[in-house]
Amino acid sequence: MKILVLNGSPKRKKSDTMHITRAFLDGMKEAAPQEVHIVDIIDKHIEYCTSCFACKRNGGKCIHNDDMKALLDEVLESNLLLFSYPLYCYGMPASLKAFADRTMPLSSMAMKKQGGRYVHVGQADFSHLKYMMICGCGFPNSKQNFEPAVMQFKLMFPNNHTIITVPESPMFNVPEAAEVTVRDWHSSSRLESSMLRQAK
């Protein structure tokens, strides 16, 4: 399985949430071979979407000449797209939100009814993709913190998604918590890996 990890933390590999994500990925690798590529979004040149809709009229080509073209190509070549990020103002950090906004070339102007809402018709085939979100925050409570980020992810990826929210995530990144972090996250990720293989 090809896994593309989008690390939305400006702290890069020092991210508390990314520490949890790495433990989760290690567990998945124990369950089955995985090809993992971690991208620190903060280091990528990603211009803001200007909503010009050029990509909707020309078959998916964006007006910006930056790193998004290569990233979108890698997205479509992956099996699992994993968003790893700390909660910023009840949502994604700005650099990761810019990435999400720039996925516009994957869909056309045409719309279709899906369930109880309308969605854009795809310009690319991403039906094979599964999506995961691992989001951490420093607060001890999940309620009245993660709901906006969870709702956004569910609306963006209504099918084939897994959402993991972790309150007090900095606590998992201290040496004293290493054993618990490895044990618990390896166990849950082995189960997730098994479920993903069965869903193919």
Predicted regions: what is each one?
Residues K29-P33, M156-T162:
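Structural alpha-beta junctions
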